[in-house]
Regions:
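Mg2+-dependent phosphoryl-transfer active-site scaffold
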Residues: 1-210
Length: 210
């Protein structure tokens, strides 16, 4: 078992805020009862009022969140995960996601038959779990093989990732996909591996801090 434990003051601030709200307004709030569809909360990102919000205070993050106009917890998580070295290095990734998220352009993965894997990220590879699922469905990887690919990205192990290149491409070609198209996809994955998030980790962080 791997435990990722973060000692964040933000959690103490939230606890204190709950106590203040109860004392002053008689309203009892907990992490479990806070509504996740509260429009004024999402307007904070739209209006760039992100001072004091963990991971959202940087100017680039603030501007990008306002542009994407997140309307759900997963969309906040997507924004935080995209403004990272991996996605930032993929040409057109951030701009494309913002346009798809806001409805300006179609939300399509380069291989549309796998859109179901990328529905919540508007056609873009954002999380390690998506890569694992894609390697199984598109390339015929086994579960352990897909996890090997995920770990290569999680640990930023370029050599381990490249060792799976031929298997990834050959597996996709066997399912009828063009070799050059799949090779281009793998190249973008290599950039993605510079810094990518596990969805479970990111959602927990989003719930705790955002």
């Amino acid at each position: 078992m791997k435990l990722d434990i973060l000692g964040l003051k933000t959690l103490s601030v939230l606890k204190q805020a709950f106590e203040y709200i109860k004392d002053r307004h008689g309203v009892v709030l907990t992490m479990e009862t806070i509504p996740l569809d509260d429009a004024p909360t999402y307007n904070i990102f739209l209006n760039k009022n992100t001072a004091g919000i963990f991971q959202m205070e940087e100017s680039l993050m603030t501007e990008y969140a306002s542009r994407c106009m997140p309307k759900s917890l997963i969309e906040i998580s997507n924004v935080i995960s995209l403004v990272r070295p991996g996605p930032l290095g993929i040409e057109g990734c951030l701009d494309g996601y913002a346009k798809s998220c806001s409805g300006e352009s179609p939300a399509d993965f380069p291989f549309p038959e796998y859109n179901y894997i990328f529905k919540e990220t508007y056609g873009y590879l954002v999380y390690q779990e998506q890569l694992s699922r894609l390697s199984i469905d598109m390339c015929g990887f086994t579960g352990p093989e897909s996890d090997e690919l995920r770990k290569a990205c999680a640990k930023k192990n370029r050599d381990a990732l490249l060792s799976l290149r031929d298997k990834f491409i050959d597996g996709a070609v066997k399912k009828g996909h063009g070799r050059d198209d799949v090779a281009n996809l793998f190249d973008s994955m290599e950039e993605f591996s510079r810094y990518s998030f596990c969805l479970a980790h990111k959602i927990v962080a989003s719930v705790s801090n955002d």
